[in-house]
Design a protein with these regions (language model features):
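Bacterial N-terminal signal peptides
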Residues: 11-22
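N-terminal secretory signal peptides that target proteins for export/translocation
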Residues: 1-8
Length: 235
């Protein structure tokens, strides 16, 4: 058995345990239930699909389709399909929070390394396994791929968000068992909040709250995109 096969089996097992545990413990104490996690489908030796998310285990990348929201100011990079925070989020991803988190587990991101913010605008930076965020759009041969930071503008300084690794925090479960990322409908944020699954550890993003806007000149609202998360080696 190859090392990659062993890794694949380990990741699938980890994913299955998380799904089972998350489904068990994420049951709220009201009639509303969390979304059912789609089955993990194998597309090739190192390629998987879960719902609308493509997973490349070898490259340690996940990609999910979405649409650019037409909003004024940003607090979140990506929200869930039908998520409550779409009015202040850059991209509506075609997935729910539980499925998105499951896909990230499949590329080896580990919540055991995370320091999750304990409040909105937490002054203590979040920590976690590092990742890069990329956006793809258009058709070949004009298809473009840029880092997400190039699309997030600080209106005060007229500069883009500084490039650097984002971190996997995994969100958090509330006392009643509900998964906060699913409850709030947020996947990726930059204001040091306990809700999103991926956060920006930089202080500059929090300090620029209220001034971060989408670069509409580079990528217009309504555009269909691929949101890509690439896991990086843990230092």
């Amino acid at each position: 058995m190859t090392p990659c096969s062993v890794a694949n089996r380990f990741l699938l097992t980890t994913c299955a345990v998380w799904i089972a545990g998350g489904t068990l413990f994420a049951q709220p104490q009201n009639p509303a239930s969390p979304p059912a996690v789609p089955p993990v489908e194998r597309l090739g030796e190192n390629r998987l699909r879960i719902g609308h998310i493509q997973v490349d285990v070898a490259a340690r990348e996940v990609a999910v389709t979405g649409q650019v929201n037409d909003v004024q100011f940003l607090e979140w990079v990506a929200n869930t399909a039908g998520g409550l925070k779409a009015y202040e989020s850059a991209i509506t991803a075609d997935t729910d929070a539980i499925t998105f988190n499951t896909a990230l587990l499949l590329i080896g991101l580990d919540k055991a390394h995370a320091r999750v913010p304990t409040q909105h605008f937490d002054p203590v930076p979040p920590r976690g396994d590092p990742a890069e965020l990329w956006i793809e759009w258009g058709e070949a041969p004009q298809r473009k791929r840029v880092r997400i930071e190039q699309l997030l503008l600080n209106k005060r300084t007229n500069t883009t968000l500084p490039e650097g690794p984002w971190v996997y925090t995994g969100s958090t479960f509330l006392a009643d068992g509900r998964y906060m990322a699913e409850l709030d409908g947020v996947l990726i944020g930059f204001v040091h909040s306990p809700a999103p699954i991926i956060e920006n550890p930089g202080a500059g993003a929090v300090g620029a709250f209220g001034s971060i806007v989408w670069n509409k000149e580079l990528l217009a609202p309504g555009t269909t995109v691929n949101l890509i998360v690439k896991a990086l080696p843990v230092q």
